[in-house]
């Protein structure tokens, strides 16, 4: 009987450890908010904004959602250091930014697939999808990063922008040196 109780206790302990480790490895999901909510939140608790500019028809956008943004290291880092915003580059959301109102006057709700480009997408200078746009604590555009980024590629930008390392780059070679010396820590 004692041997049975010991085995049962050991099984419970193993199950408990498994649950704890699973929660640590799985991390937290990114809490995506609207651009308006992020700008408002910055006033109370200044953090940079990471904006995922996507379209519904974009394959690499969907892949980035699945492979990059669901990566526990990426999700934890973004959740801790950024306000995360998803913005449909062809959607009909109204955006108020620096006393300007941006809309998508040619948006067609019936249209399947590609739609008209939102004015805010054009204002941000987005030329392809997905594009990650970084915005400072003060609401100023830092930089767009165009194209699919795997967790390690995105890690470079997340950390470089969070730490302000990009502000010392004075020529293109500076970024190349930074890239060459960067050692990613995020795992797949």
Regions found by a protein language model. Name each.
Residues 29-32, 71-112:
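Thiol-based oxidoreductase modules, predominantly thioredoxin-like and allied folds used
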Residues 28, 43, 125, 136, ...:
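Non-globular targeting/processing and membrane-anchoring segments
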Residues 62-66:
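Detector for the c-type heme attachment site
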Residues 45-49, 80-83, 127-129, 137-138:
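Loop/turn elements at helix/coil->beta-strand transitions in domains of secreted/extracellular proteins
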Residues 1-29:
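Bacterial Sec-dependent N-terminal signal peptides
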Residues 45-59:
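Short active-site neighborhood of thiol/selenol oxidoreductases, capturing the structured segment around
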Residues 103-110, 118-133:
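Structural micro-motif
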């Amino acid at each position: 009987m004692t041997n049975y109780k010991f085995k049962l206790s050991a099984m419970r302990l193993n199950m408990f450890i498994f649950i704890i480790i699973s929660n640590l490895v799985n991390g937290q999901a990114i809490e995506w908010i609207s651009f308006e909510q992020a700008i408002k939140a910055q006033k109370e608790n200044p953090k940079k904004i990471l904006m995922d500019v996507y379209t519904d028809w974009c394959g690499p956008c969907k892949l980035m959602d699945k492979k990059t943004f669901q990566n526990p290291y990426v999700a934890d880092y973004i959740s801790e250091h950024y306000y995360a915003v998803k913005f449909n580059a062809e959607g009909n959301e109204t955006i108020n930014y620096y006393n300007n109102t941006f809309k998508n006057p040619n948006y067609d709700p019936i249209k399947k697939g590609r739609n008209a480009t939102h004015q805010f997408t054009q204002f941000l200078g987005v030329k392809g999808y997905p594009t990650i746009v970084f915005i400072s604590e003060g609401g100023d555009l830092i930089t767009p990063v165009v194209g699919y980024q795997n967790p390690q590629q995105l890690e470079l930008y997340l950390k470089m922008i969070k730490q302000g390392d990009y502000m010392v780059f004075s020529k293109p070679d500076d970024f190349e040196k930074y890239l060459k010396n960067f050692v990613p820590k995020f795992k797949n």
